[in-house]
């Protein structure tokens, strides 16, 4: 069962255009496909009213969150804030935040479409919400394998192909910057941190 999906768009960059030569992203369809594929492959049982929230923002906004929750005063591509409830009981699985400038820059540098890269970031963020991590080398390898299979189901090439999937320190990496780890939820929600962008809800199935 795909959870209910809440999407909020804080930065107009997400709705104006993709990278050069690309059409604007269809965020609703992209997110629903990515999370649906992740749920199917992970084989998880979710609460009937499970919900996940996504915020599409700019680098300045995610930099503030990264500094507040992880002590890193820099923008990043994606942050995840899992619920502290047990997965099978959680009505709110958590939040995924993705920044436009960093994500678009990575996609361009890696010669991949913005849609493919953002799909990867959504999958990566959602896997954090359901318990995957990459703090240790073994965890990173397991998470990367799951990402590769899910993205293949979506018709997206292996994002780690030609790179060192696991760095010596155990971080899962892509060119330019590692996909970011999750933060602690600390009982916050996107409703508390969102400055008033566009939002919409997709029905689960």
UniProtKB/Swiss-Prot annotation:
GO terms for cellular component: cytoplasm. SUPFAM superfamilies: Metalloproteases ('zincins'), catalytic domain. Its cofactor is Zn(2+). It comes from the Bacteria. GO terms for biological process: rRNA processing. One of its GO terms (molecular function) is RNA endonuclease activity. Residues 162-205 are annotated as: Disordered. Keywords: Cytoplasm, Endonuclease, Hydrolase, Metal-binding, Nuclease, Ribosome biogenesis, rRNA processing, Zinc. It holds the Pfam family YbeY. Its main location: cytoplasm. Gene3D superfamilies: Metalloproteases ('zincins'), catalytic domain. Its EC number is 3.1.-.-. Binds 1 zinc ion. Zn(2+) binds at residues 124, 128, 134. The keyword rRNA processing applies. InterPro entries: MetalPrtase_cat_dom_sf_prd, YbeY, YbeY_CS. It is an enzyme of class 3 (hydrolase). It is found in: Cytoplasm. Belongs to the endoribonuclease YbeY family. Single strand-specific metallo-endoribonuclease involved in late-stage 70S ribosome quality control and in maturation of the 3' terminus of the 16S rRNA. This is Endoribonuclease YbeY. The gene is ybeY.
